[in-house]
């Protein structure tokens, strides 16, 4: 899971990672399989409600949060560089509802684009664009109406952007 803006003051982004086997140690060098890059995870965290604490070690079954500078996506794998492993992907569901979404205030375009892209990277919505079109408006696809409500709420409360949503017929 990827979650943006867990701390609004810092606009941080946390990737939640389940340890599948073995032992994880703070500062351990890992391989991000999808990019092929090695990285050190220096500040893994355990989160409980609003509290965060640095974790020195984690074992199979534990879930830790790691700072994500935009490298991770849902379903990514990190492993010991000496023991590369690949998991099959996580299924995505075809959207059933579509809407054109745009910001009410054109001066909020940057916040709108960043918010929509981050929420899409978290897997809450899918974005569709027409070829050679900008980001003034986007077509958003969702599985259920609640996802539109989550999008509107998060854009307003986390990015200070109010949106106009025009539902599209399913075709």
PLM features per residue range, with description:
Residues 1-171:
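Structural and coupling elements of P-loop NTPases
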């Amino acid at each position: 899971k990827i979650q943006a803006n867990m701390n609004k003051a810092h606009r941080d982004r946390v990737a939640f990672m389940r340890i599948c086997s073995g032992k994880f140690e703070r500062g351990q060098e890992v391989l991000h399989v999808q990019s092929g890059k090695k990285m050190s995870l220096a500040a893994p965290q355990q989160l409980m409600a609003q509290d965060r604490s640095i974790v020195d070690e984690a074992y199979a079954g534990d879930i830790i949060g790691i700072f994500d500078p935009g490298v991770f996506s849902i379903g990514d794998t990190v492993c010991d560089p000496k023991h590369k492993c690949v998991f099959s992907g996580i299924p995505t569901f075809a959207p059933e509802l579509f809407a054109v979404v745009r910001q009410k205030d054109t001066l909020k375009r940057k916040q709108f684009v960043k918010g929509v892209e981050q929420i899409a990277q978290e897997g809450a919505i899918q974005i569709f664009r027409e070829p050679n079109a900008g980001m003034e408006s986007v077509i958003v696809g969702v599985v259920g109406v609640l996802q539109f409500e989550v999008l509107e709420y998060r854009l307003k409360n986390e990015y200070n952007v109010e949106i106009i949503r025009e539902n599209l017929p399913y075709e």
